[in-house]
Amino acid sequence: MDINPLLYLQAFNNDATTFNTQGHILEQQSDSPYFDTFANAMQAYLDTKQGGNDEEGTIILMDDEDFNDSESLEDFLQMLNEEELNDGFSSDDEPEEHVILTEDNQGEPSETPQATFDITEFIKTEDED
């Protein structure tokens, strides 16, 4: 598969690694092999989206030609962050209450942890040829 956009993957409380779509490691802060690190980060992201653990994560796909300076990239990341946090309901709406009936709780709303996304830092790597 010959795709040009970069895949920026950050898994908080996990190894944060930046990959491109051909699978080459642009920056890695761990001694783990590529596939182990990628699988761990993807699992953390999926668990977070399902509300299954306390880790935070996000995956961002973008074309580096569209975001060739850090200012426009920061604007894009901020927009994406706000979109994720506000996805599903407007400021006038309230989140729906989910009820799970079990033997322990009959009709009580569940306290499922919600996924949160925090894009606080972005490291832009340049080709140094």
Curated annotation (Swiss-Prot):
Region (Disordered): 86-129
Biased composition (Acidic residues): 86-96
Bias (Polar residues) ranges: 103-117
Source domain of life: Viruses
Family membership noted in the UniProt record: Belongs to the asfivirus D129L family.
Protein name: Uncharacterized protein D129L
Organism phylogeny: Viruses, Varidnaviria, Bamfordvirae, Nucleocytoviricota, Pokkesviricetes
